[in-house]
């Protein structure tokens, strides 16, 4: 049976951008329903278990430059949810190829999901006054408007009706939801044509993340990461030893393919992709990979790294009712860029709704 649930605001996507947007809205006294189709929060700040092995297979670390995100990280650090990993990585896999620049690289205490989980726990805790609800496993099928409100139908026949909405998935997915709801510049006069043009130019590289559980320590140099220079020309962009990183009790590698390889082999059978990447990773695996690799798993990130960056922290699709897109394609492709985008989007929506209330 169809049912409609009224909400003050709705945020689609419970990655770092969506969580930070919710944080701002709750601080402004707004109630929030935060939706994500995955089983948990965090988005690409993702940690996986393979038996007793623990590995980050999405974002590998983050840096802090700005005060706003720095405050969030400081709170999480005090709670033990994040720790400093190092100040740089080898650029070529050698002990002498260290690329330190003095900036701290942070990681989750037990994996990269620890930071988003810490933010989520605070949002649904007593301090928020019950103003935030997080629904995982919730698939949004469209975003539209009716009667001056945003309508967000879910695949379970529930429709959320909100005063305002923030979309934080990868931009192509957000555009698909808006298009499914009929919110195109041609179909809706109040839509922002310039906003659509800006969003439609955003593109992403895919990325294969290969996880390899090893029977012995790897050859990855301390502190457990190799961030290859693009000029190196190989198909591997990154290798991490999650045991050296401090999150896994046993040796397990995370290998990220570069954008060119991932595009070229995106539809290649997974076993073939794993064979190719393992062959290129041989120098950092002790022994014959045929016996040294005791378990393996491949994850395919379709929208891994934005190749087009929108300098503004958000793009407003509609002002009446307010709808905005935010996330990792805004203000920089790093974790901090996504967080800063979410914070800005949350503040924007709170201001718009406060202005509407004042005028009413």
Where are these regions (language model features)?
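FAD-binding beta-loop-beta segment adjacent to the flavin cofactor pocket
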Residues: 244-248, 298-325, 329-331
